[in-house]
Amino acid sequence: MVPALRYLVGACGRARGLFAGGSPGACGFASGRPRPLCGGSRSASTSSFDIVIVGGGIVGLASARALILRHPSLSIGVLEKEKDLAVHQTGHNSGVIHSGIYYKPESLKAKLCVQGAALLYEYCQQKGISYKQCGKLIVAVEQEEIPRLQALYEKGLQNGVPGLRLIQQEDIKKKEPYCRGLMAIDCPHTGIVDYRQVALSFAQDFQEAGGSVLTNFEVKGIEMAKESPSRSIDGMQYPIVIKNTKGEEIRCQYVVTCAGLYSDRISELSGCTPDPRIVPFRGDYLLLKPEKCYLVKGNIYPVPDSRFPFLGVHFTPRMDGSIWLGPNAVLAFKREGYRPFDFSATDVMDIIINSGLIKLASQNFSYGVTEMYKACFLGATVKYLQKFIPEITISDILRGPAGVRAQALDRDGNLVEDFVFDAGVGDIGNRILHVRNAPSPAATSSIAISGMIADEVQQRFEL
């Protein structure tokens, strides 16, 4: 007999569904700041869904919301391995609403970021979620950076980023009085928000529409059912079995995985390809002391170096008024390793046997050494920051939080730059859709991504 599962869902009613017993309803929260999800439970005999989303981060929750709003007659559930939602990449990022300037023209990142930023601002206004459209300067501090800055500006225009302009020293000072620079791109549509608050609002919308959220459900297997469950009246209507580490299982017709740092492993569990592999990069942030936060008004970014895969250390205001400096980018020895000495033997073994990572490390050895040096010595990071704001000293800096970025890597050692969506082959492959690579700007793009996923699900699964 399948053990009963605990759901973080409303117990106020029943939603429509395509299986016996329906789905727990929502508690009718008013719009505005997301409230805690209300508790409820369901018996094992009704642990079946038409669609299951694996992963309770911002992309998974946005996708669940989009699907249930488009298909209100379907029963849809979200599985999350933690006791709370949106606690990893969604809850450990800089909170920047990106404009879409950095990405290759015509790529999914470029299209979905520009579209997603506009949708996100609109959503926050509708829901009363606080945000600040504080803008961003991408600043050239050396003469040799100016051609790269101008090329980036042209890329932004190709991507349709609104409001971009090139500005000179005097205009840089008007926007950021303490920032030095020769030339900058002014990105007025860049902003900041608390993405966990946005994700919890998505979850609230999902539940109000009749969706169900299961926490503490760590998936360890996804397979096709071999027979009907004991005492089931559904027979083989729900042919996919999803099992967790506690021996519990649910059944469903279709699966969408949005597993972030574990997207490759979840794909492999379902019998699909593990490639591209996920490599975890930890990013450490520093904090400006409160009495020095006046030095920064909006986002200040360096000109990215196309030889290296990350954007570089930058200045980021937060919704609480603090200023974050960073992040760096160093290889993490645990997929959820937020501290320098966090270690997982399984994750390290993945790193050792990953031929693509060995190639990446050899191609970017000097960059990696520099990032490790900055992570260990505050003075090195401060020296870099002083290129932009000379007034900053090491006594103005505190160590801050960290995040871990899930970055897909191919077998040739190339970082997969665009969003990747994949499916498998055979019976289960026809019933599953994997979100395989969704690093930054996935949070900014989450509403746009969810619309694309809903389109793909509708077409692929013939809903």
UniProtKB/Swiss-Prot annotation:
It is an enzyme of class 1 (oxidoreductase). GO terms for biological process: 2-oxoglutarate metabolic process; small molecule metabolic process. GO terms for cellular component: membrane; mitochondrial inner membrane; mitochondrion. The modification N6-acetyllysine is found at residues 104, 155, 173. GO terms for molecular function: 2-hydroxyglutarate dehydrogenase activity. Its cofactor is FAD. Changing residue 176 to D: In L2HGA; alters protein processing and abolishes catalytic activity. Signal peptide: none annotated. Keywords: Acetylation, Disease variant, FAD, Flavoprotein, Mitochondrion, Oxidoreductase, Transit peptide. Residues 1-51 form a transit peptide. It is linked to L-2-hydroxyglutaric aciduria: A rare autosomal recessive disorder clinically characterized by mild psychomotor delay in the first years of life, followed by progressive cerebellar ataxia, dysarthria and moderate to severe intellectual disability. Diagnosis is based on the presence of an excess of L-2-hydroxyglutaric acid in urine, blood and cerebrospinal fluid. This is L-2-hydroxyglutarate dehydrogenase, mitochondrial.
